[in-house]
Amino acid sequence: MIKIDTSDIDKFVIDLKDTSENIRSDVQKVLKKSGFNIEAKAKLNITNNGSVKTGHLRRGITTDVGNMEVTVHTSNIKYARGVEEGTRSHIIRAKNKKALYWKGAKHPVKSVRHPGSRAKPFLIPAFEKEKEVLIRDLEKVIKW
């Protein structure tokens, strides 16, 4: 009969599982920290680039933390992409009313030609600034 002592291997597997859980926990902490850093930088960018009129877009930048993932996004703000990427010229037509009118207009109109708007990126630059820090912090956690 051949006997093999696996106690060292069993101990190694247990240590490896513990290490794996610790690494997962540390990675989650790094992701969470970077997510909130990106959110803060995006809010600062939106303020600094002159895009804040009501504060609605800035308040809409949020961070969601999940299991081994973090998402920084603009929740339910339809014009956020237009601010980030800019817009082409387009025609705005009255939807519910028969005409468009705004303070200072000479008379109501059925449509107006919007010249478009230049991009005022806020989210992508925030990520780009944080990316190197995130990679460095993840490398520290994963090396053992």
Where are these regions (language model features)?
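Short, Lys/Arg-rich flexible segments
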Residues: M1-A80, R93-W144
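Short, His- and charge-rich active-site/binding loops that engage polyanionic ligands
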Residues: H90
